[in-house]
């Protein structure tokens, strides 16, 4: 079974993937100082609660946009699961899709695994919208080439900036406003309107402009924890794929399975035998 570790700026998701089925997933706050042992204590206990054992894990893939987390996640893979992890985005990794942009090496690994999953799951042109710490819009053409996109502040980031810089504004929950009116009758209603309806306007406006530039029919795929929140009041999404990133990581692993990794008393050593 594959352990897929998706380390974002806000949370790290650990998912167990068996073939094309995602058997379980757990989430922990991203913390660069957390050690491999700390990850293991937390993860192995949750696996046990779910009825899984360490011995069932025979492969690991890691996708991180937070470099300081990578080393300890690699140690976690080697020390506790006995395998060398495949690292998404590590040169000279061949993604299996063309990356048709300026400076391909600067594109985030999370955006590329989303592109890979979008290409394999849907035909034609695709726009993958991922609601994370940043909100990203990524275009994958009908041949599977990654053609670029948009990076905008995520909704939590926008709210943090608003509350942090405006001393008299209160912290509010990110939720669907209680009224369809965009005109707030109180400070809280006005903030809900700006955050929620403002984001709807951004999503619809940017997606429409991308469609106009592409000039061909496009499937719009939404992913990330807040996708379903916005789907209530916009018809711009054709598909919601909550696990797009994890599915892309599993596809990447299928294409580029790494070698075995064995531990011994003097440290860790790769035996380079195929899985």
UniProtKB/Swiss-Prot annotation:
Binding site for ATP: 6-13, 133
Positions bound to substrate: 108-111, 187
A Pfam family hit: Pan_kinase
Gene Ontology process terms (BP): coenzyme A biosynthetic process
Subcellular location: Cytoplasm
Annotated residues for binding of K(+): 130
Pathway recorded for this protein: Cofactor biosynthesis; coenzyme A biosynthesis; CoA from (R)-pantothenate: step 1/5
GO cellular component: a single term: cytoplasm
Cofactor: NH4(+); K(+)
Main localization of the protein described in the UniProt heading: cytoplasm
EC number: 2.7.1.33
Quaternary structure and interacting proteins, as annotated: Homodimer.
Family: Belongs to the type III pantothenate kinase family.
Protein name: Type III pantothenate kinase
Species in which this protein is naturally found: Zymomonas mobilis subsp. mobilis (strain ATCC 31821 / ZM4 / CP4)
